Each structure stands twice: as C-alpha cells, then as structure tokens.
Curated annotation (Swiss-Prot):
L-ornithine binds at K73, N257, E258, I259, F260, N287, S428. This is L-ornithine N(5)-oxygenase. The gene is Ao414. Disruption phenotype: Impairs the production of desferriferrichrome and ferrichrome. Displays sharply decreased conidial formations and exhibits significantly retarded conidial germination. Shows tremendous increases in the nematode-induced trap formation. Its cofactor is FAD. GO terms for molecular function: monooxygenase activity. It is an enzyme of class 1 (oxidoreductase). FAD binds at E49, R50, Q51, Q52, Q53, F54, V55, W56, H57, Q68, V134, T425, L426, L427. It comes from Arthrobotrys oligospora (strain ATCC 24927 / CBS 115.81 / DSM 1491).
Length: 485
C-alpha cells in the first residue's frame, strides 16, 4: 500500500510531482485515488500534516453520535465500488460486516467512521510526514521559459524549517474555528466545539459540581454539546443561546439530498454567481444551523421532563434562550468568563450580563487558511487584488497561462462552497472529487490547459495505458472536510 516511488530532480534538488498540504479525509481520498487510478505510473507524492497522527473531528467523537451521511459515501465507493478502501471492505477486514448489516442502518457511529478513516490512513503511513506545519507556498520560475514550473513548500517541524519543491500542490487544510466577534481567540474557559472532548474535562474536573455552562450556537454541534454536557454534569446550569427562534431540523429528504450528488457540482459551477448565492441561501437547511430531528426530540423531551417535575422552573438544569447573541465579553478570572448577552424580539432589546465557568462555542469554521499560505502566488493571478483565489471546475487555481506552465498548478479543497456548492466542505463528494483532481494533475490532455480547467471524463474512463505516460516517483511519506454530511 502507498507505494509511490522513483525520484525526479531539478538542478540536483528533488522535485515532487505532488505535495498535499493537510492529510484529512480530502487528501486521504486523493491518496486512494492515485493508488487505484495510477497503478503503474507511481508518481512521487508527499502528504504534510500538522497533527501528530491522523485525526478527524476528535473533539466531537461523542458517545453514541452517528454520521449524518450514508456509509456508501465513503472515500472510494462512488468513484470505484470495487475499491479495497470502501467502508464495507473495512468492515469485512475487521470481522464486523455481518454484524453491521444486522444493525439495519446506513449511518454508522461517528466513532466507527473515524476508525475507518484511520484504517485507510494507515495504508499510506510511509507517504505522510506528520507533525509538520506548512507556512508558505512560493512559485519558482524557470529561467529558460520564463514561466513558473514548480513551487517551494515551506514548513516547520518542531521549530526547524523545511523546504521542498513540487510541480503541483493541493491545499486541503480544513477550517479554522470561528468565534463570535466579542470573544477572544483564546481563553482557558472558552472552548470551540472542535476541542470539546479534550478541553471540557480539563476545565471541569468535578462531575458533580454546580458549574455554570453556556453553549452558543444552533447547529448539530451546538445541540450535541448541549445535550452531552448536561448529561456529564447533572448538577450544572447549562444554557443554550440561539440567535434564531428555535432549533430547526435538517432537511435530508431525497429530492433535497440530490444537491450533494457529484453531478450537482457541475450544474452549480456553471450557474451564474448571483444564482449560486441564492441557491446556497435556499439550501442552508441541509447543513447550517440545523439539527437531526431525533436529537431535537431528545432535547425537547429532556426539557419537558424538567417542566413535569418542577413547573416553577426553579430547579431546571437545562435552558434554551432564543433571539439572543453575544455582544460583549469580560475576563473576570482564569476560571470565570463574563458575557454580555443581548435579547432582541418584537422590536425590543434587552441586555443581560452573565457569569460562566465555561463557554462552549459551536459557531462553525472559517475556510480561509489557504489565503495566507498561498499569498506569494497571488502575483500569478490575472488580477492579484481579488478577495478569493479563482478556481476552475477541476479545483485548480486560475493562474495566468502566461505566467504558469500547464504542467504545474495549485489545487484547493474544502474552501470552494461559493463555486462548487454546499457539498464542497462535506464528505459527500470526496471519492469522486479526488478522482477529478488526480485526473486533472496526472492525466490531463493539452486541451485542458489553463483556459477552462475542466477534466475530460471521470475516473471510470481512465485507462492503464493513459497512466503509463506519466513519470514515476519515489514517495517520502503518504485532508477537512469538517462536516459529518
């Protein structure tokens, strides 16, 4: 497994065919696609990962939490149902296939899907350099052609700087935790949901203490942490703050779910920008600020039992305050946080100050970490002043054809929702998308070029003969989607 090999050099320096920045599900799907689509070409590939080991939503692997997506939308099945990297083959290899079938579900535990991802990642351990943070990607111009034909990838490992060169770079760094503006980026008592499982027990060590806990957010992660923390600390006062009027169920009905089909990406990309924005707004109920209905019903039942046992509300441990958002922050101590909460309803505004022992923030992620990493490459764009890096359908950054060789390029993963649709940050299209990226990098014809960036066909059309054309390479060590969708 993961046997990419044979080195290429330029002026005595090793040049990789591809370096992937980040080794989460997106890059892992690419690793699988390379192995299956290029069985003979064996390109020279390296994956760089900031974490010390493969991890996927480790902060939200809560007891009993399930996936929100069918296991069939794993890292390989939709591209190659016969792949050895399917979830079903993982079950077979681990002796649980029949037992899982007996469960009668398409939604495995998140814990099990994480184990599946780690199982896949272990096959490429020799192609990954863990504990390495990429800081910058710089273009390298060929003095003979005057065009950029490779890139220098700068990284740090334990304070030591590393540089490597690659013809192609895939940036799949996931999202960074997004906090409401009044809150500081770091405070020991403010925890983003992505760090929930590790930091909450560190901060709240007494399971029986009467802590004051706030949960900010209205989506799946907010609801899960609200329910879980109330269960972990039964004597705590836990309050959930929503900007809207209530927790709303996610829409995963069959017709709506078609927006997550791989073919929907083509349609969305070809849609005018104004219409794309409108479609994203219309379909927010599939992914943003929504909760699985069964969890909503559980929370409602918990609140109902409180009301049954104490109609006065004096002893209630769980509360939801709607139409309320954070408008101020005060650092009271290392163990206490002061929040100013503003309630707006029916044209009236009420401001309240609260003290909490812990604030859990589940307000999503920003998908902009690639901007700083790729800043030196902006000079290669037709317009270096644009806010976002423009990309083609095949996820390749639209650099000027006069500045960058057609045999070099940068690809973005998981930060293209405005051009490729709601599925871009999710698991839904990873298998097919990985095939498209691999085909664009290693199998593109001259007609693909920089002008349109479209891949001519999908993985099923790739032939072994096509694969033989490409350079062999010698690998060093073998991506986030953040959503569970």
């Amino acid at each position: 497994m993961g046997q990419y090999s044979v080195e290429s050099h330029e002026n005595g320096e090793k040049v990789y065919d591809l370096i992937c920045v980040g080794f989460g599900p997106a890059s892992l799907a690419i690793a699988i696609a390379i192995q299956e689509m290029l069985p003979e070409a064996r390109p020279n590939v390296l994956f760089l990962e900031r974490q010390q080991q493969f991890v996927w939503h480790s902060g939200m692997l809560l007891p009993g939490s399930k996936m929100q997506i069918s296991f069939i939308k794993d890292l390989a099945t939709l591209r190659n149902p016969q792949s050895s990297f399917t979830f079903l083959n993982y079950l077979k290899e681990n002796g649980r296939l029949l037992d899982f079938i007996n469960l009668g579900t398409f939604l495995p535990l998140r814990e099990e899907f994480n184990d599946y991802l780690q199982w896949c990642a272990s096959k490429f351990a020799n192609l990954v350099s863990y504990g390495e943070t990429v800081t910058l990607v710089e273009p390298v111009k060929n003095n003979n052609t005057g065009k950029v034909d490779n890139f220098v990838v700068h990284s740090k490992v334990g304070g030591i700087e590393e540089t490597r060169r690659a013809k192609h770079v895939v940036v799949a760094v996931g999202g960074r935790p997004l906090l409401p503006k009044p809150l500081p980026e770091y405070h020991p008592r403010i925890v983003h949901s992505s760090q929930y499982s590790s930091r909450v027990p560190q901060n709240l060590t007494d399971r029986n203490a009467a802590y004051r806990i706030a949960v900010i957010g209205a989506g799946q992660s907010a609801a899960e942490t609200f329910s879980d923390v109330a269960s972990r600390y039964p004597n705590a006062q836990t309050t959930m703050f929503l900007r809207g009027d209530s927790l709303k169920p996610s829409d995963d009905s069959p017709f709506v779910n078609e927006i997550f089909n791989p073919s929907a990406t083509d349609k969305f990309f070809q849609t005018p920008a104004a219409e794309r924005h409108q479609q994203l707004v219309e379909n927010r109920a599939t992914n943003y600020s929504v909760v699985r209905l069964e969890l909503i019903e559980k929370i409602y039942n918990d609140l109902y039992v409180q009301r049954l046992r104490d109609p006065s509300g004096a002893s209630w441990k769980m509360n939801i305050k709607n139409h309320t958002e954070v408008t101020g922050f005060k650092n009271l101590s290392e163990k206490t946080v002061g929040l100013q909460m503003t309630h707006r309803e029916n044209g009236l505004e009420t401001v309240e100050n609260h003290e909490f022992d812990l604030v859990i923030v589940a307000t999503g992620y920003a998908r902009d970490m690639h901007q700083q990493i790729l800043d030196p490459t902006r000079e290669l764009l037709e317009d270096a002043t644009v806010a976002r890096f423009p990309i083609n359908r095949d996820y390749r950054v639209q650099f000027s054809g006069e500045k960058v060789s057609s045999d070099a390029g940068i690809y973005l993963q998981g930060c293209n929702e405005t051009t490729h649709g709601l599925s871009d940050t999710l698991l839904s299209v990873l298998a097919v998308r990985a095939g498209e990226v691999v085909e664009s990098i290693f199998m593109k014809s001259a007609s693909n070029g920089h002008s349109n960036g479209h891949s001519n066909g999908h993985a099923s059309k790739v032939s072994a003969k096509k694969a033989e054309v490409y350079t062999n390479g010698n690998g060093h060590n073998g991506v986030t989607s953040n959503g569970y969708h």
